[in-house]
């Protein structure tokens, strides 16, 4: 067939839709109740006898320029490939993969876009039955869409994540029909879709044709209101095409049954219901049966829930309780399919959210597949449903074009904004999970948002409206005050009333916080303590759920990010910022969230008494098994199960009658383990300290024998010796014929060498700029002297290092003193003194050594079993752990410092023949080990860049900076930074035992 393809609509600002049907609720019709009952909410769109599913194989032609399409496209003479939908061009090899954060992919001249855009043409032939009405539905197409049927134009749509529907009754027929979908890469609407993600195009969600009779259901509304006596009234409206002798029967899961006719409206009063919440996701399956006489001619299912949302001054109340939204921001992203996530993919995410103790999700930054919200209804998640609006490119460089309010304060765009908000609302209006509507993200303000806000309050005044961007505009806030990455200090000021008038009088919500990029986020527990400190604080949503990355198991780099695909414009690895890896394996950040979001919290009160607090608002703890393990010096000594139930939002004192708890001479910990009684799944484990003592001072025996000859210092002890080269440091450490040190260290540094830098964390981003200015990132420890001295009444070998950058500048000086006794025990004291005035913010101070690579097995007494830092440790209780050097680091997509174990009192690394043990002296240390050096880590952009050079690189740090969330959020607070100054040198000591 021949088609005259529309060539100007995507650039015509006056047109963002043509012939598109008004937005309505998502549902799937069936011909009968019997057909409906064969399916569930996930399978219904694929199995309904009223649906012709178009997803699957299409003919596909990709044109890199619109001008390359013939004036009249003849599908019979067009060369087509085969493409499977849902999919995107970028993930199927047609267009360049590109990750962009805040920028537009074209020059900013709103509303104008490059006219000659890339276009994808999809063709499919389908057989349709005879019926009275046909509607073609696209659940998601990026960017703009024009639809044709049998050579005729059906309509046009913008708004990638909103449903687009067209009535094709008049241009379709019984039998074979040709469907053509033309997708334009960009349109005027692209100015409203500048979200932080890989920019992709294509039919990325399901599309299908609905076939209906003369009488059909088009839309419905279920709106409940709570009465003073705690019953609910339910208003029901059904719209569609209804002839005489038709009626609607509504059956609500044993709750009620009613029949409508004529106006198709009714009100059911004083229903006694089980309320919906994330803790108690009580949904009622509703069957809507359209009848002609006594015969059902159409059947529809939906789900309803009953909730009451109110704002009382500064307090957000859900079913009369001041809930805490412990949430995440969720993008549609898949490691191979990009935007084209399946319902199984979405359900996996929902299940993981619940497993990791989330109770809320923000659909950043667009409406999701409608079934995602059904899953939120059923599994129990408070949803912040966000409109497909973001104009972040007007915040971005170059600064001469910085104008964040550019579109939002231009009322010419108001109809474009409103269309997206209205379509979100109409599609999702019946979901009990929708706790707030969101007007979009990072688009400035406020005139276009005002129009959208007024619309939402006119149709759904019960549900609060959220928009973070208002905080930087004249509006300040709509129904709640929202911030991104507000610091704990800001929250404390809000509590004190000193943060400013804009933070008063409304609930406070952190729509994004704890930026989870790479290693971290740190500080999550501090946020939790603040959330629970005031009813004004609603909680927040961590940024973000999962890493965005492109996976190819056969490529040089299996996981790629911005810049890896030769794209001219990109924003690097800023997309790799999730709690979960792209394959949904949890990072240590996800483990931290799981513990911090736990529903029960314990506190030791002394005298064997503990307080257990149930942080849930609606349910007691009868579904949770609470057990405990008492450990002494990291090893379990006693355990038990508590027979107790804690009421919602309540605390209860319990007593554990164990004499161990009274022992103040040892480390005594109580680990509380919370499990789901029904499934046995661990909800969380938290550790409470009953007693914690400082490490004892390690005492050495008699001095070893020290001898010097030329450039060599030899220290001799029982069955071994240590050899120092005065120009190289400790070059050999041998006992019982075992050499502990690597003979030719990869970083060309011998012995226990001081360091002050780390493989930069993504969350070090703000500080890295400063560190690079002063040259900290390229500084090297240069050995200045190595000699025998008397110190603290003993002989030692003192090595002095200067940290030199750019060949001449000295940032700091370090002394590393080695004390030996006659048994071969070695005490090391490391001291760092300031030279450069700018080095008051260090990432770490410690020493490292390259051991013989046969040292692989690790045992330690400290925090574990996975990496942890001072502000990132709730997931890592103190204990005795065994692991291997190979398993110590985490394999982040962008390599960075990882694998640190904090609060360590003792650690050992062993081979088949020997063991080296590190003992804390007065204060615990940080311990790490891996098979690559700091230099190799710092140079790597991908994990594949790190060579396997057969070394065991061991670090004993006295001081390690926290992680914070400074890739976008706050840096670690002062107590998790390293305090270093001219009058505050850094010093610590540890002991090494060879055996």
Predicted features and spans:
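Beta-strand/loop-rich accessory regions of lumenal/periplasmic or secreted enzymes
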Residues: 91-93, 140, 185, 277, ...
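Extended acidic/polar, glycine-enriched regions
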Residues: 173-176, 239-310, 668-672, 676-702
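Intrinsically disordered, low-complexity Pro/Gly/Ser/Thr-rich segments with frequent PxxP/GP/PP motifs
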Residues: 258-271, 634-664
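Extended substrate-binding grooves/exosites of carbohydrate-active enzymes
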Residues: 2-46, 100, 191, 295-611, ...
């Amino acid at each position: 067939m021949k088609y005259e393809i529309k060539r100007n609509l995507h650039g015509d600002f006056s047109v963002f839709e043509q012939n598109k049907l008004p937005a309505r609720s998502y549902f799937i019709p069936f011909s009968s109740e019997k057909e409906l009952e064969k399916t569930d909410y996930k399978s219904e769109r694929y199995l309904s006898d009223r649906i012709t599913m178009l997803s699957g194989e299409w003919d596909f032609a990709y044109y890199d320029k619109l001008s390359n399409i013939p004036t009249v496209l003849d599908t019979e003479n067009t060369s087509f490939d085969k493409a499977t939908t849902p999919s995107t061009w970028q993930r199927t090899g047609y267009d360049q993969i590109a990750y962009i954060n805040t920028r537009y992919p074209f020059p900013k001249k709103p509303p104008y876009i490059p006219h000659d855009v890339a276009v994808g043409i999809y063709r499919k032939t389908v057989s349709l039955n005879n019926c009275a009405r046909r509607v073609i539905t696209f659940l998601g197409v990026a960017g703009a869409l024009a639809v044709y049927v049998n050579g005729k134009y059906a309509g046009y749509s913008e708004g990638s994540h909103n449903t687009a529907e067209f009535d094709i009754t008049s241009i379709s027929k019984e039998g074979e029909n040709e469907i053509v979908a033309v997708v334009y890469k960009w349109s005027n609407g692209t100015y409203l879709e500048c979200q932080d993600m890989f920019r992709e195009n294509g039919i990325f969600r399901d599309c299908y044709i609905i076939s209906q009779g003369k009488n059909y259901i088009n839309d419905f509304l279920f709106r409940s209101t709570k009465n003073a006596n705690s019953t609910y009234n339910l208003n029901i409206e059904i719209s569609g095409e209804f002839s005489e002798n038709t009626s609607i029967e509504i059956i609500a899961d044993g709750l009620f049954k009613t029949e409508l006719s004529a106006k198709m409206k009714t009100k059911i009063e004083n229903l006694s219901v089980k309320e919906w919440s994330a803790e108690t996701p009580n949904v009622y399956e509703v069957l809507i049966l359209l009848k002609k006489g006594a015969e059902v001619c159409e059947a529809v299912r939906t789900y309803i829930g009953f909730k009451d949302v109110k704002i009382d001054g500064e307090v957000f109340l859900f079913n009369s309780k001041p809930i805490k939204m412990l949430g995440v921001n969720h993008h549609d992203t898949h490691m191979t399919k990009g935007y084209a996530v399946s319902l199984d993919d979405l359900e996996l995410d929902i299940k993981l959210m619940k497993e990791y103790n989330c109770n809320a999700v923000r659909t950043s930054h667009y409406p999701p597949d409608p079934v995602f919200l059904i899953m939120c209804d059923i599994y129990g998640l408070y949803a912040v449903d966000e409109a497909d609006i973001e104009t972040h490119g007007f915040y971005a460089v170059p600064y001469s074009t910085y104008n964040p309010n550019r579109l939002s304060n231009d009322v010419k765009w108001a109809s474009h904004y409103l269309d997206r908000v209205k379509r979100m609302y109409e599609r999702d209006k019946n979901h009990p999970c929708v706790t707030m509507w969101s007007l979009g993200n990072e688009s400035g303000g406020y005139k276009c948002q005002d129009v959208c806000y007024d619309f939402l309050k006119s149709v759904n005044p019960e549900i609060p409206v959220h928009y973070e961007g208002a905080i930087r505009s004249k509006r300040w806030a709509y129904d709640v005050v929202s911030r991104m990455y507000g610091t704990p200090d800001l929250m404390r000021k809000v509590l004190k009333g000193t943060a400013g008038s804009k933070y008063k009088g409304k609930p406070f919500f952190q729509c994004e916080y704890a930026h989870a990029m790479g290693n971290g986020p740190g500080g999550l527990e501090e946020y939790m303590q603040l959330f629970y400190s005031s009813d004004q604080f609603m909680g927040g949503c961590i940024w973000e759920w999962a890493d965005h990355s492109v996976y190819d198991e056969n490529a040089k780099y299996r996981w790629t990010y911005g810049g890896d695909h030769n794209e001219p414009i990109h924003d690097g690895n800023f997309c790799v910022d999730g709690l979960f890896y792209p394959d949904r394996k949890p990072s240590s950040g996800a483990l931290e969230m799981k513990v911090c979001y736990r529903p029960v919290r314990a506190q030791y009160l002394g005298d064997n008494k503990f307080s257990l607090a149930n942080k849930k608002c609606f349910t007691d703890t009868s579904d949770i098994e609470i057990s405990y393990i008492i450990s002494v010096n990291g090893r379990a000594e006693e355990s038990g199960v508590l027979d107790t139930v804690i009421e919602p939002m309540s605390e209860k004192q319990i007593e554990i009658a164990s004499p161990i708890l009274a022992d103040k001479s040892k480390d005594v910990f109580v680990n509380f383990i919370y499990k789901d009684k029904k499934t046995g799944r661990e909800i969380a484990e938290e550790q409470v300290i009953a007693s914690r003592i400082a490490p004892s001072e390690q005492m050495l025996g008699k001095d070893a024998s020290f001898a010097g000859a030329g450039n060599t210092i030899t220290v001799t002890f029982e069955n071994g010796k240590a050899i120092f080269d005065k120009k190289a440091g400790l070059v050999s450490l041998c006992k019982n014929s075992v050499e502990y040190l690597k003979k030719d260290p990869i970083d060309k540094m011998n012995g226990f060498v001081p360091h002050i830098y780390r493989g930069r964390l993504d969350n070090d981003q703000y500080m890295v700029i400063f560190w690079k200015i002063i040259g900290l990132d390229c500084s090297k420890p240069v050995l200045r002297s190595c000699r025998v001295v008397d110190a603290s009444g003993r002989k030692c070998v003192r090595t002095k290092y200067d940290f030199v950058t750019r060949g001449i500048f000295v940032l700091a000086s370090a002394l590393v003193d080695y004390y030996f006794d006659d048994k071969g025990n070695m005490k090391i004291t490391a001291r760092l003194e300031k030279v450069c005035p700018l080095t008051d913010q260090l990432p770490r101070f410690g020493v490292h050594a390259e051991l013989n690579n046969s040292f692989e097995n690790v045992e330690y007494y400290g925090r574990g079993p996975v990496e942890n830092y001072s502000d990132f440790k709730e997931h890592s209780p103190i204990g005795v752990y065994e692991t291997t050097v190979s398993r110590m680091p985490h394999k982040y997509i962008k390599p960075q410092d990882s694998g640190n174990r904090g609060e360590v009192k003792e650690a050992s690394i062993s081979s088949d023949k020997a063991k080296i043990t590190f003992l804390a002296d007065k204060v615990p240390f940080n311990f790490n080990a891996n098979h690559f050096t700091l230099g190799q880590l710092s140079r790597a952009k991908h994990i594949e860049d790190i060579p396997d050079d057969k070394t065991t690189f061991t670090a004993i740090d006295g001081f390690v900076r926290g992680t914070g969330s400074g890739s976008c959020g706050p840096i670690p607070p002062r107590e998790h930074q390293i305090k270093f100054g001219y009058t505050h040198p850094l010093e610590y000591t540890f002991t090494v035992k060879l055996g």
